[in-house]
Amino acid sequence: MEDQEMQLKVKRVTDKFTESMYVLANEPSIALYRLQEHVRRSLPELVQHKTDMQSWEEQSQGAIYTVEYACSAVKSMTNSSLYFKNIDGLLRQAISLKEQISSSQGRSAVINPNETPAHTSVTP
């Protein structure tokens, strides 16, 4: 009876050992199979993420370009304050000259009451 039990235990140990050796011998191929399986499952999702990221990158590059262009426009406007001051001075000078012309026409109308003015203007 002890012999049968011993033989059974020896058989179990040898079977386990044989199974372990078989697994160890075939483990690299199983690992490669699992790796291939994982890549096949994951790759479409990763490709989709990559295309999404490229699309977002293009959109963000467009937005960055727009913001940089707007910033340069604002900087150009702040640098043009000198030109606006010059324009303001010229407009004030033109208004002053127009008022002088209008007042001189008014005096000439008083001097020659027989002439009718060709153009009367109203200044606000």
Curated annotation (Swiss-Prot):
Keywords: Lysosome, Membrane. It holds the Pfam family BORCS8. Residues 102-124 are annotated as: Disordered. Belongs to the BORCS8 family. It comes from Danio rerio. It is found in: Lysosome membrane. Disruption phenotype: Borcs8 knockout results in decreased brain and eye size, reduced muscle size, motor axon defects, anomalies of neuromuscular junctions and impaired motility. As part of a BORC-like complex, it may play a role in the movement and localization of lysosomes at the cell periphery. Associated with the cytosolic face of lysosomes, this complex may couple lysosomes to microtubule plus-end-directed kinesin motors, driving lysosome movement toward the cell periphery. The lineage of its organism: Eukaryota, Metazoa, Chordata, Craniata, Vertebrata. This is BLOC-1-related complex subunit 8.
